[in-house]
Structures are given as C-alpha cells and as structure tokens.
Amino acid sequence: MASDGRIVLADSEPTPGDATGIAAVVATLVERILEQGPDNLDVGGIGIGAAGFVDVDRATVRFAPNIDWIDEPLAEAVGKLVDLPVVVENDANAAAWGEYRFGAGEDTDDLLFVTVGTGVGGGIVHRGMLFRGGFGAAAEIGHLRVVPDGRLCGCGQRGCFEQYASGRALVRDARARVESDDPQAQPLLMVAGDGEAITGQMVTGLARQGDPMCVDLLRDVGQWVGEGIATLAAVLDPRVIAIGGGVADAGDLLLDPVRRAFEEHLPAGEHRRIAELRLAALGNEAGIIGAADLARTGG
C-alpha cells in the first residue's frame, strides 16, 4: 500500500484449514507480491488483520472464534519467514483505522466504526489514536448485551448485539418468515428456491426492488443497529459514526432506519450535539488498507 492509502499490488489465497499453515500462506503472498512489483518497490513491514482477540503487543492472537488460534505468536511466525517487521491487529480495528485515515473518517479525529456483516464488529479512534483498551481487546461491540437472557451467542452469552443487528440475524429472520408460510415471503422463496439457501444478498437485492417483506427485514436490522449505536454513543460521544460491512451495501434502506432509531434512543438527544452517521467508504478493502497503514505508521 502506498502512503496515500492506494493499494499498489494485491493477491489472495484461501485460508488453510489447518491454522498452523496460515503464517506460510502469508509469507507466500508477500513473496509473490514482491516478485510482481517493480525493482524499486520499498516494503517496510507487514500488517495483518486477524479476526480475534489480539494482545496489546500487536503480535499475539489470544483467541480467534473461527480459526484454531489460542495464544498464537502470529507476528513472530510470519516474521521468521519473511524477515520484515510484522504488526497484527484485530480485523475490525484495522478497518476502523483504514476508514479513519483514508475513508469516511478522514476529516475527523474521533470515529466510531461499526461493521455489520455476518456478525457485528467495530473500532474506535479517539483523538487520532486507535483505542485498544488495557489488554488490546477493546471495541468488541457485537457482544454488547442488548436483550437480557436473549438469543444464545457464539461467545457463550445471551442477548448480544450481533444476534439482532447482523447479516446472520437478517437471514435467520427471513428464513423464519418463509417457514411460517408468510405469503409475503413468496418472492424471496422463488429467488432462493429453498429457505436454507436464503442469503443476505438475496434479501438486499429484493429490498432494492421494493419487495415489502425484505424492506421490513432490513428496517428491523436497522432499528437494532440504531438502538445499539445510541447506547455506544452515550458512552463514547463520537463525532462521526461510520457503518460498513456487507449489510451496509443496502445503503439508505439500512441507514435511514438506523438514523431514526439512533436519534430516537440517544439519551437527551435534544440537548447534545449528535454524531454524523455515514456509510463507510472503503468497502472490503478497509481492513487491508488499515492493517498496512498500521504497519507503516504504528497507529
């Protein structure tokens, strides 16, 4: 990545099933990109966005829910193979930093980034610094409990934010409408062919075409997102809130109900300055750009 946030060269490889092979895959990608680049390509370090709890040292993944990593010294493992400095950061934190530096938050020094995808993630930039907490695991906003004794979450708790305000929740609720033989679900069933084949992209696509049920489903998710970020804003008081992730591809179909619920549920909203809500600007590249910039600048 260039210093202005441009991705100069890109490549990809599937994540191996065996977590012990990930360092080798990263090293292979680095070597391949170096081979593709010009002779004067200057690479100062490697940034890795990892979906999990990353220790304050930005080197060790303490736990990853979808990869068999526990106390994984990822920076050391990759560094031994590529002979370059390595910085590891939580993937949502990296995306937040990317949006702050080069995207939706580049005109502020105070940003709350919320990613609404399969789950809910986030990152906090305060006074131009990425807020990581005392142990490196701050901003796990998807596990803010919003419904006491609510739906069981993969983290082991019940009622977490992401159980109601995520792509997973959107699909679950859409399938429930199909299984209940709701007549409004017929257009979605015709697209999917089967309730189990429903995806968030299908729901969003039909919502864009004006399908009433799919518009309602996105409105429900937006309502939950808005209520959740109102609670977060009461604690963090951000200037800008950027919303990204796959569900955010729905644009105003999601953002309008988010904004309404946010303003309705923000404590004492009529007596305070209210954060500006924006759609994230960098899409799926936010984490790549943020991780690379953290490796370059240290964040």
Regions found by a protein language model. Give the residues of each.
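Short hydrophobic alpha-helix segments
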Residues: 11-13, 65, 134
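Active-site glycine-centered loops adjacent to acidic/histidine catalytic or metal-binding residues
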Residues: 91, 117, 291
